Curated annotation (Swiss-Prot):
Its cofactor is [2Fe-2S] cluster; Mg(2+). Its EC number is 4.2.1.9. This is Dihydroxy-acid dehydratase. The lineage of its organism: Bacteria, Pseudomonadati, Pseudomonadota, Gammaproteobacteria, Enterobacterales. Pfam families: ILV_EDD_C (PF24877), ILVD_EDD_N (PF00920). The gene is ilvD. Gene3D superfamilies: IlvD/EDD C-terminal domain-like.
Length: 616
């Protein structure tokens, strides 16, 4: 029988000092035999996805205490990728994932906590907490802050839905008036919550459902809706049950590594492909799998991407649907139900509620359930009122969207496309692969060949795009922006958005060893591995080289002879200690970022730290 970790600090005469300090936090004699459960919050006033979380940790803690546990809350950092976008702040976004994972490990191990409830929401916070959970392997439940309501405004006598990306595109479009740009800016992000499309934050919160580590509805139920409160209440109660099952009954099925098994990771990636999730999810799932010591690689993702169709299309791939519409159609469980009926899921998996996949679908799939309360929960909709308060409205759709032929979520027979929303491409400058969000690529450019225009920083590329130096037919290459080369693997949302602003969204390609925001669409290919700073062949591309992209056949090729590439590599190596570095880039890189870069691996490894450099 495993011993409560917290007993290390609460039992024995030699721990009198620790108990004295615990007493100073409010604990009493009666508490020293109870499990100590960490409430891992991420409240901050910097991030709309987290601005409403201040009181939610207390909500969870009260339920933990009522169920017989001791709750202790702490906070992690949280970077807003949208605010950090387009300037030096973006260098810090991906590295913050590692800091979050480490800080959770530090706090939980330093204080010998027995279990966790992770209150996450935005881009790097959910992945960081997920990595920590699988590293620590103690009972955990995730409950996120929830999606933002979609923005709405009236343009040309028509009410249209909006999100953050619309504000970015219109703000840089010279054809858009100042007044219209201002109108869109003021309407794009109306409430608290993670940005309203299938961007990275919402993608990851959906994937925690598929991994089994969060409750049904976690990924899609709006931050503002009163129904979301129940997820927090349930999490506080349920984590005590899971904790006691493991420590008092020796039930290892309560541990996250046994819930988020390889089969569950495959289901999560299948969901991601089917819903056209953010390409960043590939990075984060690879990283999380390594923490769980699961052999889940780009090869597994490639295999899945070749057989999973696209069953859901959401902003930024379309403006018709946002997360509130996904929820109305049944949320993550609705998509999983269609995938299960198509025979594309591993059924021998369980979630934190202790339900198998078939049991979960029977109870929570709107196409199957007989439970009116579940149907009512999935009718939870937006109020259209600007607010930063959680659970502030209780509006409902008049009906569910159960139209699997023409609705937001489709059946296999009515799929948006037989190919899924993400694909892995390989070629002579992406030997270890690269990622494209096919859900956002127009059919007319699934095959594309054009001359390279090479830039060694995102800033130079943006200047060229807005300055008219990039024209229809070009392939924009942005390199030395990978995990090591950036450092920090910046998101390229501004370059892709500005291509649209300049009318080039369907006329150009963009390739990078950096990454893309979940808000990116278009022929945007990222995560090129190995990255330029690690000696990757993307560092050998020159202006004017032809690059051929073939998404249907999963290929990407630099049309330069092997002999010429070998000569270029030799010339690059001859630069000595300047080899595989940008030739003309001035960038201030702090010691903290240099430390990150010294251990960073390329994207095909999840951009995690290279343990071999630490002797591990």
């Amino acid at each position: 029988m495993p011993k409560y970790r917290s007993a290390t600090t609460t039992h024995g005469r030699n721990m009198a000092g620790a108990r004295a300090l615990w007493r100073a936090t409010g604990m009493t004699d009666a508490d020293f035999g109870k499990p100590i459960i960490a409430v891992v919050n991420s409240f901050t006033q910097f991030v709309p996805g987290h601005v409403h979380l201040r009181d939610l940790g207390k909500l969870v803690a009260e339920q933990i205490e009522a169920a017989g546990g001791v709750a202790k809350e702490f906070n992690t950092i949280a970077v807003d990728d949208g605010i950090a976008m387009g300037h030096g702040g973006m260098l810090y976004s991906l590295p913050s994932r590692e800091l979050i994972a480490d800080s959770v490990e530090y706090m939980v191990n330093a204080h010998c906590a027995d279990a966790m409830v992770c209150i996450s929401n935005c881009d790097k916070i959910t992945p960081g907490m997920l990595m920590a959970s699988l590293r620590l392997n103690i009972p955990v439940i995730f409950v996120s802050g929830g999606p933002m309501e979609a923005g709405k405004t009236k343009l040309s006598d028509q009410i249209i839905k909006l999100d953050l990306v619309d504000a970015m595109i219109q703000g840089a479009d010279p054809k858009v008036s100042d007044s219209q740009s201002d109108q869109v800016e003021r309407s794009a992000c109306p409430t608290c919550g993670s940005c309203s499309g299938m961007f990275t934050a919402n993608s990851m919160n959906c994937l925690t459902e598929a991994l089994g580590l969060s409750q049904p509805g976690n990924g899609s139920l709006l931050a503002t809706h009163a129904d979301r409160k129940q997820l927090f209440l349930n999490a506080g109660k349920r984590i005590v049950e899971l904790t006691k099952r493991y420590y008092e009954q020796n039930d290892e099925s309560a541990l996250p590594r046994n819930i988020a098994s390889k089969a569950a990771f495959e289901n999560a990636m299948t969901l991601d492909i089917a819903m056209g999730g953010s390409t960043n999810t590939v990075l984060h799932l690879l990283a999380a799998a390594q923490e769980a010591e699961i052999d889940f690689t780009m090869s597994d993702i490639d295999k899945l991407s070749r057989k999973v169709p696209q069953l859901c299309k959401v902003a930024p791939s379309t403006q018709k649907y946002h997360m509130e519409d996904v929820h109305r159609a049944g949320g993550v469980i609705g998509i999983l139900g269609e995938l299960d009926r198509a025979g594309l899921l591993n059924r021998d998996v369980k979630n934190v509620l202790g339900l198998t996949l078939p049991q979960t679908l029977e109870q929570y799939d709107v196409m199957l359930t007989q439970d009116d309360a579940v149907k009512n929960m999935f009718r939870a909709g937006p109020a259209g009122i600007r607010t930063t308060q959680a659970f502030s409205q209780d509006c409902r759709w008049d009906s569910l969207d159960d139209d699997r032929a023409n609705g937001c979520i489709r059946s296999l027979e009515h799929a948006y496309s037989k190919d899924g929303g993400l694909a892995v491409l390989y070629g002579n400058f992406a030997e270890n692969g690269c990622i494209v969000k096919t859900a956002g690529v127009d059919d007319s450019i699934l095959k594309f060949t054009g001359p390279a225009k090479v830039y060694e920083s995102q800033d130079d590329a943006v200047e060229a795009i807005l300055g008219g130096k990039v024209v229809a037919g070009d392939v924009v290459v942005i390199r030395y922006e990978g995990p090591k080369g950036g450092p920090g693997m910046q998101e390229m949302l501004y370059p892709t958005s500005f291509l649209k602003s300049m009318g080039l969204g369907k006329a150009c390609a963009l390739i990078t060893d950096g990454r893309f925001s979940g808000g990116t669409s278009g022929l945007s290919i990222g995560h090129v591995s190995p990255e330029a700073a690690s000696g990757g062949s993307i560092g050998l591309i020159e202006d004017g080289d032809l690059i051929a992209i073939d998404i249907p056949n999963r290929g990407i090729q630099l049309q330069v002879s092997d002999a010429e590439l070998a000569a270029r590599r030799e010339a690059q190596e001859a630069r000595g200690d300047k080899a595989w570095t940008p030739k003309n880039r001035e960038r201030q890189v702090s010691f903290a970022l240099r430390a990150y870069a010294s251990l960073a691996t390329s994207a095909d490894k999840g951009a995690v730290r290279d343990k071999s450099k630490l002797g591990g």
